[in-house]
A protein has these predicted regions:
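Short coil/turn segments at secondary-structure boundaries
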Residues: 3-7, 18, 40, 49-53, ...
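Amphipathic alpha-helical interaction motifs in eukaryotic regulatory proteins
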Residues: 3-7, 41, 55, 78-85, ...
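Switch I (effector-binding) loop of TRAFAC-class P-loop GTPase G-domains
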Residues: 6-32, 147-153
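Core residues of folded domains in eukaryotic genome-function proteins
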Residues: 21-23, 31-36, 57-61, 93-97, ...
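Switch II (G3) loop of P-loop NTPases
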Residues: 29-50
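Short acidic, S/G/P-rich loop/turn micro-motifs used as interaction or catalytic elements
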Residues: 44, 67-72, 106-107, 172-175
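Inter-motif core of Ras-like GTPase G domains
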Residues: 47-74, 78-91, 97-101
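Conserved GTP-binding G-domain of TRAFAC-class P-loop NTPases and closely related GTPase folds
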Residues: 84-194
Length: 194
């Protein structure tokens, strides 16, 4: 849903994908500047497989969150984000990270600030749980993921080696299917990291 709307500025019906897609996005105000957007599949069983394929070349990551369903999906969202954040390649390259809180046109959508706070809390819980669990079944204890954040402190995004920002947006815009998408904050961020 996100990539077609960003490219066209208009709402378009989509379905959860099972393959990646890419397109060149021309920055507004500077048509000579462009970035290649790679949209990873939304299907949860394929996400990490495709992340593995593209993470080494990523200069930036846009992590899209459904602001309406966030409350009931917070554990799953945090789990996937945790896997991204502790990945050794992502940590080494430290690409800029934007958490795009989508569906802000819906009245019950959670704010970017609330989503950030709840993700920090849930990621902290995951970090504590993971650090207490054995790292392997064979007892070798090696090869586990990197520590998320600073030891002895509750997790917050400022502890990461990459800059993390949160923005509110809407692929549908304020007029629903007939209106323009509201990606101003996302477009500003893309121009900044391009």
């Amino acid at each position: 849903l996100f990539s077609p709307q960003l490219l066209t500025g208009r709402y378009r019906d989509t379905q959860t994908s099972i393959t990646d897609s890419s397109a060149v996005y021309r920055l507004r105000g500077d048509k000579s500047a462009a970035v290649t957007l790679i949209d990873l599949p939304g299907h949860e069983s394929l996400r990490l497989q495709f992340l593995e394929k593209f993470k080494a070349a990523a200069r930036a990551i846009v992590f899209v969150v459904d602001s309406v369903a966030f409350q009931r999906e917070v554990k799953d969202v945090a789990e996937f984000l945790y896997q991204v954040l502790v990945d050794s390649t992502v940590l080494k390259n430290a690409p800029a990270l934007l958490v795009a809180c989508n569906k802000q046109d819906v009245t019950m959508a959670k704010s970017a600030k609330l989503i950030q706070q709840q993700l920090e809390k849930e990621l902290n819980t995951l970090r504590v749980t993971r650090s207490a669990a054995p790292t392997s079944l064979d007892g070798s204890g090696t090869g586990g993921p990197a520590q998320l954040g600073r030891k002895g402190k509750d997790f917050d995004f400022s502890q990461l080696p990459m800059k993390v920002e949160f923005v509110e947006c809407s692929a549908r815009g304020s007029k629903g299917e007939e209106g323009d998408a509201d990606f101003q904050s996302l477009e500003k961020w893309l121009a900044k990291v391009a």
